[in-house]
């Protein structure tokens, strides 16, 4: 399954997780599989998803509402990197990634939050104060959505974020990531090395 996207600065999808359309549910499934396969708890994964729903309605090519497509001075993407050039130029430009692919945006969260291209994104003003503790926390999805908003997004808090996180937690609870990494499913780890500015960057994808 690949990510769905609409390259737009208009609101075309809903911010209410419970009212998500099939394209959004597909993207939510991709996000759930991505973070769960990397060891994030169900609650932390849902918290990240709840914030993304509020920021972009789970559209990886969402430009900031009221802006225009291509405006790199305002927000862009699943978590509305602001300005957009932070994601587009610094990250995609460095590694040669497709800006519309939600996979690489999730990869940014997973690999760039601590010690990434911009240093540390997680500021730890509320518990869990460390990124590693957040990733495995089994606090409620709603409480972790608040922690992600304050420590990572650093944006305005809305109970919509909590409600979305709780919804996605209940929706996916107990469903293992696909493909699984428990040894029962045969998987092949595909690794591509990309040489950028003298460094090798390893990109991991799992396939059945």
Language-model segments: which ranges?
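Peptidoglycan-targeting cell-wall enzymes and recognition modules
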Residues: 3-30, 37, 56-140
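Short, functionally critical alpha-helical segments immediately adjacent to catalytic or ligand/cofactor-binding
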Residues: 42-59, 109, 149
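Charged, low-complexity, helix-prone segments enriched in Lys/Glu/Asp/Gln
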Residues: 51, 80, 84-92, 145, ...
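C-terminal binding/interaction regions
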Residues: 131-133, 145, 149
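Extracellular cell-wall/glycan-interacting regions and their flexible linkers
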Residues: 1-49, 68, 155-208
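A charged, solvent-exposed segment within the mature domains of Sec-exported extracytoplasmic proteins
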Residues: 140-147, 154
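Mid-sequence acidic-hydrophobic segments that form the walls
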Residues: 112-116, 151-155, 171
């Amino acid at each position: 399954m690949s990510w769905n996207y609409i390259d737009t600065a208009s609101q075309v999808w809903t911010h209410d997780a419970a009212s998500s359309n099939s394209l959004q549910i597909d993207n939510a499934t991709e996000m759930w599989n991505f973070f769960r396969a990397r060891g994030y708890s169900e609650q932390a994964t849902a918290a990240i998803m709840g914030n993304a729903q509020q920021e972009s309605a789970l559209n990886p090519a969402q430009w900031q509402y009221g802006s225009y497509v291509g405006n790199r001075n305002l927000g862009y993407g699943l978590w509305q990197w602001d300005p957009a050039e932070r994601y587009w130029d610094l990250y995609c430009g460095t590694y040669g990634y497709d800006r519309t692919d939600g996979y690489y945006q999730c990869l940014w969260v997973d690999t760039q939050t601590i010690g990434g291209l911009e240093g540390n994104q997680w500021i730890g003003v509320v518990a869990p104060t460390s990124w590693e503790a957040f990733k495995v926390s089994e606090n409620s999805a709603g409480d972790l959505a608040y922690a992600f908003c304050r420590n990572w997004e650093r944006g305005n808090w809305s109970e919509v974020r909590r409600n979305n996180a709780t919804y996605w937690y209940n929706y996916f609870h107990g469903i293992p990531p696909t493909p699984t990494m428990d040894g029962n499913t045969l998987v092949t780890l595909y690794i591509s090395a990309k040489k950028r500015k003298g460094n090798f960057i390893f990109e991991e994808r799992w396939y059945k």
